[in-house]
């Protein structure tokens, strides 16, 4: 029986400090003879059982580090994983992929069950180059450095040192002077770390470009499309950018005029674009946040609340803000335990409430998948699917925001704010996607050119209706606050694609709430070996980001917002 080396929220069934043991267990798989289809299926099962043990330990160490970037022992464990274990895994993963793909029984595997796995393995064999391993290790080291810098970022606020998320939360404030003060404080903090951010990003762009060249690609963008096994093309992305600019941005401009009028301001500045019209914050203590979200989930479906309460009881939620904690929020799976963990570093605000609901969409999806199919492997976890259920959960709970905003006007404002967020998810991630297309197809760009391009794209999309006069430099450098550009490149457009699906789910919910919730659960527990389109269909929506689809959902969203007024 394997001993659990951890008393934490994750199971540590393999000692990653014992590198010889880890290597021996992986190598033993390579020595197994495969003489039939059933042998290959058993080999795949044994490989999965070993890999999920390793993955759970790696995930636990990573979450530990994000929870406390200043703990030397935790950091040492995490860096050992990045510098020693990950390179070992890359090397042996390539060997196992070759063994699998070269087997004469590989193409005899059942297409429905193994088709996606076959395509992913073939892509990985095509992409693998041993000379890229040290480059990828260096890439991870730079991402770790980014987390450390951002985790340690504090801002002086009224003579008190406050974590960066607290300052971000002040952008919600009803008082315009507070919002403007918070905006400039954030920009000042960005300016202080800008040289470090530029140095990290400059090196990341060059590393990633070299990784792509080594693998036989012209640029990192093209490499990543293969690495992500995308079910759409580069041209599809460019068309999506164009269609959103054509149909969503004009609607966003009209909506901005409404918000500007409600705020009673003559000019619509960046700190007005963040304002919330309801009383803030919606809670003061994390316990109150959890109590309220549990109720909202329970009113939507008892299973949703059951999973949330279970996570709360078992230490699978870390939601408060503190110094030394990595920025952002995420949900990650623990494949041996069959659990999910939600991490968030946000101060009390409307956004932190929505962020928790969003991550619980991921968590519910994870629990449903595990209960139906067991541990999901990385290749099955496509973000176009995952984000459908996180955005979908936000919109299924839209009519329950009165739990935090009991006064009618505040409740209406909160609903409008969530729908405004849906608008931002249609154009914001697309702007980030376009920015990265430019960065990685122009790898010799300078830091100054990068800032200028970011401002230009921001002005075309989210800041189109905003008066940015005199703030061009500050806005240009603000890309550095987005962890996706550093840690998960080209993980942007998935948010916008999935939001189109989530809006269809809301449309269905407004017609038949019970049926829409059942469709959510059906899709969230679907066989992930299917195509993205098939999983969307099981959820009762279409995987469609064509011009007619963008136009239709933009019109629907604008009408729903108008109906609330």
Where are these regions (language model features)?
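Glycine- and acidic
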Residues: 127-128, 185-193, 230-238, 272-281, ...
């Amino acid at each position: 029986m394997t001993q659990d080396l951890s008393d934490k929220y994750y199971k540590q069934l393999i000692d990653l400090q014992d590198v010889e043991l880890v290597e021996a267990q992986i190598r033993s798989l390579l020595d197994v003879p495969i003489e039939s289809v059933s042998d290959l299926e058993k080999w795949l099962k044994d490989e999965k059982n070993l890999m999920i043990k390793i993955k759970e330990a790696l995930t636990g160490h990573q979450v530990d580090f994000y929870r406390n970037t200043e703990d030397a022992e935790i950091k040492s464990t995490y860096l050992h994983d990045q510098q020693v274990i990950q390179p070992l895994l890359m090397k042996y993963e390539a060997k196992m992929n070759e063994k699998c793909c070269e087997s004469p029984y590989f193409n005899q595997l059942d297409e429905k069950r193994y088709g996606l796995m076959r395509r992913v393995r073939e892509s990985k064999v095509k992409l693998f180059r041993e000379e890229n391993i040290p480059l990828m290790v260096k890439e991870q080291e730079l991402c770790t450095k980014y987390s450390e810098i951002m985790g340690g970022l504090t801002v002086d606020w009224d003579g008190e040192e406050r974590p960066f998320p607290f300052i971000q939360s002040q952008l919600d404030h009803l008082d315009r002077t507070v919002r403007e003060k918070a905006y400039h404080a954030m920009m000042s903090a960005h300016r202080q770390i800008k040289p470090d951010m530029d140095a990290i990003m400059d090196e990341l762009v060059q590393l990633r470009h070299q990784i792509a060249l080594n693998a036989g690609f012209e640029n990192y963008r093209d490499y990543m499309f293969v690495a992500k096994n995308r079910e759409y093309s580069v041209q599809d992305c460019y068309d999506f950018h164009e269609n959103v600019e054509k149909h969503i941005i004009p609607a966003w401009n009209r909506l901005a005029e409404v918000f500007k009028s409600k705020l009673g301001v003559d000019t619509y500045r960046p700190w007005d674009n963040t304002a919330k019209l309801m009383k803030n914050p919606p809670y003061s203590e994390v316990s109150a946040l959890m109590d309220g979200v549990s109720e909202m989930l329970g009113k939507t479906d008892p299973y949703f609340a059951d999973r949330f309460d279970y996570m709360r009881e078992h230490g699978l939620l870390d939601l408060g803000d503190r110094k030394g904690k990595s920025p952002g929020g995420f949900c990650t799976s623990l494949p041996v335990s069959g659990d999910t963990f939600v991490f968030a570093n946000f101060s009390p605000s409307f956004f932190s409430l929505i962020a928790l609901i969003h991550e619980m969409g991921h968590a519910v999806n994870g629990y449903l998948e595990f209960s139906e199919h067991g541990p999901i492997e990385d290749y099955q976890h496509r973000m176009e699917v995952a984000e459908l259920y996180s955005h979908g959960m936000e919109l299924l709970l839209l009519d329950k925001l009165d739990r935090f905003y009991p006064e009618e006007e505040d409740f209406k404002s909160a609903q409008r704010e969530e729908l405004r967020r849906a608008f931002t998810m249609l154009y914001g991630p697309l702007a980030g996607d376009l920015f990265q297309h430019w960065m990685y197809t122009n790898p010799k760009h300078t830091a100054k050119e990068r800032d200028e391009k970011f401002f230009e794209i921001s002005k075309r999309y989210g800041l189109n209706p905003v008066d940015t006069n005199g703030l061009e430099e500050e806005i240009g450098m603000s890309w550095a606050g987005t962890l996706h550009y550093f840690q998960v490149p080209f993980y942007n457009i998935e948010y916008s694609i999935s939001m189109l699906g989530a809006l269809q789910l809301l449309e269905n919910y407004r017609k038949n709430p019970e049926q829409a919730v059942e469709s959510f659960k059906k899709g969230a527990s679907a066989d992930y070996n299917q195509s993205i389109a098939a999983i969307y269909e099981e959820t009762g929506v279409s995987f469609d980001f064509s011009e007619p689809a963008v136009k239709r959902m933009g019109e629907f969203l604008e009408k729903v917002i108008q109906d609330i007024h």
